[in-house]
Every structure is written in structure tokens, then in C-alpha cells.
Amino acid sequence: MTDTSPEQRVHDLLVIGGGPAGAATAYWAATAGLDTVMIERKTFPRDKTCGDGLPPRAVHQLDEMGLGAILEGYHRFDGLRAIAHGRTMEMAWPDHPVYPSYGYVVRRCDLDAFVADHAVGAGATLLQGTEGLRPLDPPSGSPKGAIGGAVVLDKASGNEHEIRARHVVIADGANSRFGRVLGTTRDRTYPMGMAIRGYFESPLHDDPWIESSLD
């Protein structure tokens, strides 16, 4: 059953997806005083297959959000060590007037949780275990292609309800389910990579390089 109460509140912004992109969006919107709601279909802390490496530009963005002190508790790396066909190259991050010359390795289960918490601390509302199902029609007179929010599913109860918003940011990943409802598709002629991720102990755990083997 979907709650369609006509007196339902209209938020300034609905963010669909609580990963780093969605949570950063929610943080900056809430900081600017916007009434912001962010939904995430899983519950934090939750994992995601990823290399866990934050390059300098990502470090800069997180530092701008006030998260630099948290990052300092994680492993710092200064560049990339590439190994291919018996050759090894160590490539340091270049000096830049804005971005730092280092990155950090942060597990996604940690990163996603503390960025989302930071958005909540700034005033955003986070609904975990909530999945965006389909868009709502916008008010009359809205620009072509606009949507007025989303019908969402509370996965714990199985109930659907509407979240209305003046603006919607869809940040639920490359395989966006909500995006597919809007008509986005993946070009199957474009190359796609697959990944397997695992954690293990290594004598190189404190090495200042992240290592990539290209053989």
C-alpha cells in the first residue's frame, strides 16, 4: 500500500542513494539550509566491492567537508606502483596548488558510514533500508523531464510511501535501479570490467604505494 496523503510535506531535495556521492550531496545541501532527505536501500555499515583507494581529489573533497581528521586515522599512500612485463614504475601523485600529493585507503564500510553520518550531522534526514521504486509526477508547469519525488519502499515493513521534493538527485550507482525506471540503459558495446575484492595480511601493509599488477 502506498501512502498518497495530499497534505504530505514537500522537501527541497531528495537524494536517492547514500554512498559517498549521495551523502556528500546531502551534506552540502543541508549545510546550505535546504530541507534534505537521503534514502539508502541498505543499512549502514554496509560493504561494497571497491579498491578502497581515495585519490587526492577525493581527499580534498572530504577535507572540505570537515572530514580530514578522520582520514588521518587510515593508511596514507603517496602514489602508484605499477608492475607489468617484468618492469616496475613508481609514480608519485604530482604537486598541485589545490589537491594534496597523497591519498588514503579507507574501507567502504567505514567511508560510506561516516560520510552519511556527517550529512545527518549537518541536518539531512537519512532513511536507511529504503529503496526508491519509481518517480512521482511533478507539479503542473514543471520543465520537461522533471520529477516530483519518488515512491519508496520501506524494506523492513514492506510498505510503500511517497517522498515529495522540489529537486531529486539520483546517486544510487552505475547500475542505478531508479535510473532504469527513468529510461537509462547501459551501452552493452562499451567495455565493462569485473572485480573480486578480498582482504589479507601483507608485509607491505604500510607501504607508501598502492600496487597494480598489469600482467
Roles of regions detected by a PLM:
Residues 118-215:
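Predominantly flavin-linked oxidoreductase catalytic cores and closely associated redox partners
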Residues 21, 44, 175:
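Conserved Rossmann-like nucleotide-cofactor binding loop
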Residues 59-113:
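A conserved beta-strand/loop capping segment in the N-terminal third of enzymes
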Residues 27-50:
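Glycine-rich FAD pyrophosphate-binding loop
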Residues 8, 88-90, 158-162:
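Short, mixed charged/polar active-site loops
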Residues 23-24, 56-57:
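Short alpha-helical segment within the catalytic ATP-binding CA
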Residues 5-21:
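Beta1/beta-strand and adjacent pyrophosphate-binding region of the FAD-binding site
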